[in-house]
């Protein structure tokens, strides 16, 4: 299987190194050489500090502890958000399998009104929720206009506050 596998990853999300512009590839040598040749002609090299920091992130025990702690923290936020949304009338939410987002079906609220404006689709839902201080991303941007995307890549306190505001918004829909 190894000869048929290509893995491409980066340091941004796993190691909180956004902006460092470091990625890596694991692949059979012929593919790695071709990718390396293409990459050398399309991008400049990453700075040496970012390269050394990435090696340290990938090889240090301290880094592994950081990742474990971060995973636990995100899992706590995910569980709270999923439980809260699944208990909210009118929202259908499958269990998220990756990243730090949930994709909630809110179409049960379409046709209702907030401050005299009708919720017609995910974009109008997002725009009206924003008036209540809740930022969501319309699902239409991801191919499902019945849904909204919410992030739990924020503090647990902010997750709780955002969900409280979302529930207040939903309660005001008539």
Description of each model-found segment:
Residues 1-174:
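PLP-dependent class I/II
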């Amino acid at each position: 299987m190894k000869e048929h596998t290509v893995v491409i990853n980066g340091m941004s999300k796993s190691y909180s190194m956004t902006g460092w512009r470091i990625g890596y590839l694991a692949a059979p040598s012929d593919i790695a050489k071709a990718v390396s040749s293409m990459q050398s002609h399309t991008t400049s090299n990453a700075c040496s500090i970012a390269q050394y920091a990435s090696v340290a992130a990938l090889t240090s025990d301290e880094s592994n502890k950081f990742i474990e702690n971060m995973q636990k923290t995100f899992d706590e936020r995910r569980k709270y958000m999923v439980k809260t949304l699944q208990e909210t009338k009118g929202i259908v939410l499958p269990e998220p399998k990756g990243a730090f987002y949930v994709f909630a079906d809110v179409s049960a609220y379409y046709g209702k009104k907030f401050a005299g404006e009708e919720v017609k689709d995910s974009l109008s839902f997002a725009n009206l929720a924003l008036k209540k201080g809740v930022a969501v991303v319309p699902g239409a941007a991801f191919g499902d206009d019945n849904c909204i995307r919410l992030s739990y890549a924020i503090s647990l306190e902010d997750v709780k506050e955002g969900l409280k505001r979302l529930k207040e918004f939903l309660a005001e829909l008539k």
